[in-house]
Swiss-Prot record:
Subcellular location: Secreted
Keywords: Amidation, Antibiotic, Antimicrobial, Immunity, Innate immunity, Secreted, Signal
A single GO BP: innate immune response
Signal peptide span: 1-23
Native source organism of the sequence: Culex pipiens pipiens (Northern house mosquito)
The UniProt record lists the keyword Lipid biosynthesis: no
Protein name: Cecropin-A
Gene designation: CECA
Length: 59
């Protein structure tokens, strides 16, 4: 009987600790990182044709 009570308490504690949690700060950091990635991607899209054209002129 005591084992069942202990098992239920441990199970509830595990659910409380390992359940869904708010992303909070990590979500904000992820959004900033995603924005940086988009800006780098767009800049590389603009610069890549210039670089390949420059390489072609150098041959």
């Amino acid at each position: 009987m005591n084992f069942n009570k202990l098992f239920v308490i441990v199970l509830l504690a595990a659910l409380a600790f390992f359940g869904q949690a708010e992303a909070g700060g990590l979500k904000k950091f992820g959004k900033k990182l995603e924005g940086v990635g988009k800006r780098v991607f767009k800049a590389s899209e603009k610069a890549l044709p210039v670089v390949t054209g420059f390489k072609a002129l150098g041959k």
